[in-house]
């Protein structure tokens, strides 16, 4: 019989008018004449109270009217209230904080890309000068004259004149046919000067570094050309 009585009391005390009548009985005044302090209690009862607010309300009532009665808050507050909105709010906040922590961990674990193979190959050739430039170009074919003209940004006539003067080299050897097909890794040299005292020749060099598998809409080849505009090399490497 005690449990149904507690439930009935709990349901009744949740209504604001019940608190009004209860306060009138305790104060010995009419329920319509509310004192200033009652406004605070009415505010608590008309809003969504949590457990701590209910305990505070009971404690204030008993301390005002019955100060000699020392009752533990657990005694005059035998029931508990589960506030779903507060629980959901705490869960949502916890998930948000966990998500932010995961994103920070992901950012810290992100590794930076390693150096390209081109840079590694260049460092493995200590005798090759570093004053080069990599260019992405589009070519119709892999003919020697086409690759050299595109890489050096020179006219076709200049390439033909250099060919007839014997100033073109392919991998250090004299070029005998300007329409010869080149492949990745081949070097194309155009001799621009000679130093007899040092036994060196100055060349403009093109290296076919890479060929992309995907072609353009016009069915042309996309390539990467490495260009040296002025490179000094021993003459013997060009005069085989």
Curated annotation (Swiss-Prot):
Biological processes, Gene Ontology terms: regulation of mitochondrial transcription; rescue of stalled ribosome
Localization (cell):
Mitochondrion matrix
Q: What are the Phosphoserine sites (modified residues) in this protein?
A: 106, 116
Molecular function terms from GO: ribosomal large subunit binding; RNA binding; tRNA binding
Q: Where is the S4 RNA-binding domain?
A: 142-217
- Keywords per UniProt: Mitochondrion, Phosphoprotein, Transcription, Transcription regulation, Transit peptide
Stretch list, region Disordered = 92-127
Q: Where is the transit peptide?
A: 1-83
Q: Does the keyword Mitochondrion apply?
A: yes
Report the main location listed first in the record.
mitochondrion
For the keyword Mitochondrion, the answer is yes
Kindly state one GO CC term assigned in the UniProt record. mitochondrion
Q: Where is the composition biased (Acidic residues)?
A: 101-124
This protein's assembly is summarised as: Monomer. Interacts with POLRMT. Interacts (via S4 domain) with MTRFR (via C-terminus). Associates with mitoribosomal S39 large subunit, peptidyl tRNA and nascent chain.
Q: What does this protein do?
A: Mitochondrial RNA-binding protein involved in mitochondrial transcription regulation. Functions as a protective factor to maintain proper mitochondrial RNA level during stress. Acts at the transcription level and its protective function depends on its RNA binding ability. Part of a mitoribosome-associated quality control pathway that prevents aberrant translation by responding to interruptions during elongation. As heterodimer with MTRF, ejects the unfinished nascent chain and peptidyl transfer RNA (tRNA), respectively, from stalled ribosomes.
Q: What is this protein called?
A: Mitochondrial transcription rescue factor 1
Source species, please? Mus musculus (Mouse)
């Amino acid at each position: 019989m005690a449990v149904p009585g507690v439930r009935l009391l709990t349901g009744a005390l949740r209504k604001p008018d019940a608190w009004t009548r209860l306060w009138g009985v305790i104060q010995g005044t009419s329920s319509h004449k509310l004192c200033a302090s009652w406004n605070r209690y009415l505010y608590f009862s008309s809003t969504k109270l949590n457990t701590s607010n209910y305990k505070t309300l009971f404690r204030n009532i008993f301390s005002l009217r019955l100060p000699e009665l020392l009752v533990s808050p657990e005694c005059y507050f035998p029931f508990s209230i589960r506030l779903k909105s507060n629980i959901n709010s705490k869960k949502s906040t916890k998930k948000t904080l966990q998500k932010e922590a995961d994103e920070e961990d992901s950012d810290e674990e992100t590794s930076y890309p390693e150096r390209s193979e081109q840079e590694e190959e260049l460092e493995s050739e200590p005798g090759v000068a570093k004053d080069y430039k990599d260019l992405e170009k589009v070519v119709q074919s892999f003919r020697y004259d086409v690759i050299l003209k595109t890489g050096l940004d020179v006219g076709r006539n200049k390439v033909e004149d250099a060919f007839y003067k014997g100033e073109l080299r392919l991998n250090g050897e004299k070029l005998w046919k300007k329409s010869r097909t080149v492949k990745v890794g081949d070097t194309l040299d155009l001799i621009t000067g000679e130093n007899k005292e040092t036994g060196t020749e100055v060349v403009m060099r093109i290296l076919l570094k890479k060929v992309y598998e995907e072609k353009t809409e016009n069915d042309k080849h996309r390539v990467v050309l490495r260009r040296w505009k002025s490179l000094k090399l021993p003459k013997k490497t060009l005069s085989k």
